Amino acid sequence: MGLNIVLVPAYWDLIEPQEGKFNFSLIDKAIEQARKNELKIIFLWFGAWKNSMSCYAPMWFKNNYKKYPRTRTETGKPLEIASPFSENVFQADSKAFVKLMQHIAQIDSTEHTVIMIQVENEIGMLENARDYSEEANRLFNSKLPDKLTTYLQKNKKQLHPWLYDKWQQAGGKIKGTWQEVFGKDIYTDEIFMAWYYASYVERMIQCGRKVYNLPMYVNAAMNSRGRKPGEYPAAGPLAHLIDIWHCAAPSIDLLAPDLYDKGFTDWTAQYKLHN
């Protein structure tokens, strides 16, 4: 086919099977094989989330619910989705990610076989549009972050049409809780979660770039076939949420929609914004 780049998963559970003990043999092998075949690599960090779920987190992480809490449904049921509101989750995920970036820098900063990193994989909430854990509820009922209100004001005439219409239909307020600013529905839940997922990713990228400055991107599971948030992985970097992601995670270099449906041109056109 003449392709010259391969996308290779970097599995957290295989890299750190025991807490604090790292094994990069599969990373080394992938880079070795790529060089032999004159290929470049984009590593996909399967860390806290892969296709919404935390299926590639290590067992020591999965088994410690108290230290590494999961998101919860509205009825309080825990999901196998690590909470983006937990500092312990972030610290464990980012520590392993930084170790990966350090290792790549040590073995590849001259040859540059690795050209880009995907941070997490198809982030998003399932079953519900947002997390209903105690910390999530506290933040949901708090005022919008100043950074977001400033962005809304500054970019009012250039927002994605969906976000602008939703905001204006709720009254166009600048100050208030998430529901006071965006209205009381499932899509406000999604906006809220998008902010905190994007904020988490921004911190991950900043941590990784401190040790090795590679381009980094995030991919998105699409909201096709008329599904509602939670029926698809809600709050990922979808077109209608692009302003939220741009504001909370300005360090992301690319947003990459995962397209399994027809209509590539139509899907990608939805991402077109002034910035």
Regions found by a protein language model. Give the residues of each.
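Aromatic-lined substrate-binding rim segments of carbohydrate-active enzymes
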Residues: M1-R70, A194-V211
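Active-site-proximal loop/turn and secondary-structure-junction residues that shape catalytic pockets
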Residues: W12, G47-W49, N121-I123, M222-S224, ...
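Structural preference for beta-strand elements that scaffold enzyme active sites
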Residues: I5-L7, E38-I42, H112-Q118, N213-Y217, ...
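Aromatic- and carboxylate-enriched substrate-binding clefts and catalytic-loop regions
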Residues: F46, A129-S133, N137, T265, ...
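Catalytic-core region of carbohydrate-active enzymes that cleave or remodel glycosidic bonds
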Residues: L39, R203-L214, L241-N275
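Alpha-helical scaffolding within the catalytic cores
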Residues: L26-K29, L100, P233-W245, K262-W267
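Extracytoplasmic/secreted cell-surface and envelope-processing proteins
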Residues: I15-Q18, N51-M53, L126, G226, ...
